[in-house]
Amino acid sequence: MLKCTTRHVHIFAGEVTADNHFVPRDDLLTLDVDPDNELVWNDAALQKVYARFEELVEEYRGRDLTEYNLRRIGSDLEHFIRSLLKQGEIAYNLQGRTPNYSMGFPQIPAEEIVGQYIPKG
């Protein structure tokens, strides 16, 4: 099974069926965004990620479906998600199971931080 996994993007060559089974396919990609819920999403931001994914897939149309090409798409999406975070369209989930500031420390006013330690830097 071909796949690409980054911190916030999982892409699989195949589909998930109604009974929650995965069926590998060479003609369909499945995208899972932020599977660990590290970020706080709104519908508009998610739609931007899905639209960017569709654009990237279209750019690769006609090329071989390889792990390398999937990684390029996943990496580009990861950078796109980082840009959404930096623009304030999404935010870190400070109540998440495992806070990991993999895209840089949160940019929020200190008075809004309750029970969280964020080093000055």
Swiss-Prot record:
| Catalyses which reaction(s) | a plastoquinone + NADH + (n+1) H(+)(in) = a plastoquinol + NAD(+) + n H(+)(out); a plastoquinone + NADPH + (n+1) H(+)(in) = a plastoquinol + NADP(+) + n H(+)(out)
Q: Which UniProt keywords apply?
A: Membrane, NAD, NADP, Plastoquinone, Quinone, Thylakoid, Translocase, Transport
Q: Which GO terms describe its cellular component?
A: plasma membrane-derived thylakoid membrane
Q: Which GO terms describe its molecular function?
A: oxidoreductase activity, acting on NAD(P)H, quinone or similar compound as acceptor; quinone binding
User: What Pfam families is this protein classified in?
Assistant: NdhM (PF10664)
Subcellular location(s) per record = Cellular thylakoid membrane
Main EC class the enzyme belongs to = translocase
Q: How does it sit in the membrane?
A: Peripheral membrane protein
Described function = NDH-1 shuttles electrons from an unknown electron donor, via FMN and iron-sulfur (Fe-S) centers, to quinones in the respiratory and/or the photosynthetic chain. The immediate electron acceptor for the enzyme in this species is believed to be plastoquinone. Couples the redox reaction to proton translocation, and thus conserves the redox energy in a proton gradient. Cyanobacterial NDH-1 also plays a role in inorganic carbon-concentration.
Spell out the protein name for this chain: NAD(P)H-quinone oxidoreductase subunit M
Its source organism is: Synechococcus sp. (strain JA-3-3Ab)
